[in-house]
Amino acid sequence: KFLHQKCDVNRFNVVIVHRRGGKTVFAINHLIKAALTNKNPYPRYAFISPYRLQGKSTAWDYLKQFSAAIPGTKFNESELRVDFSVNNSRIQIIGAENSSAIRGQYFDGIIVDETQNISPDLFDTILRPCLSDRRGFAIFIGTPMGRNWFFDLHEKAKSQKDWFTCVFKASQTKIIPKEELEAAKLAMSPESYEQEFECSFQAGISGSYFGSIIEELEQENRIQDFEIDENLPVETWWDLGMNDSTVII
């Protein structure tokens, strides 16, 4: 309920959720609610996955399940589309790999799934213009994979008007039983566990020695912004070991 309310009042939303945290169920239900309550003519919504087949396997069954009880609902299996006759609204599952098929459409709202695997060019050049004439919303959902575009969106949303961001860690949501998390922690590398279940953007930097250290510093609020004093010389020297993770100078 909290997340639906936040996404109702903010146009652009970045939702970072641990694996098996229910983000797809949230996203599909939010689209259905938005579609059925839209007063505009012919509302259009899309759930966009990195690949169409991926969207079909992760979201299509949920879309059919949660909209099946709505009178007048029609399903198009070949186009992964649901049409609601009550107000001529539509929700479709789309793959980002076929970006040319998206161009030129309009949307009242979109969900971008697994945003960490989506190229920023897709939103900048295709999706964002599709939202303009209807002032549509966008919700970016996913799990961290290093400091890529998804991380940039998360940081941007902290300070931009009409943007919202939130992080749901497995240790906080309690969705996954504690004993299962303990078992996963034993089976996975510390970095992978932190990334997939604790939503760490640092852990995704494979082979890095500094990732866990910076993560700890950030959690302790020991990394701050300071005004630049141009009278003081500052030098930093780094060898990040991108090709050889055993070398530090």
What annotation goes with each model-predicted range?
Residues 1-246:
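Phosphate/NTP-binding elements of NTP-utilizing enzymes
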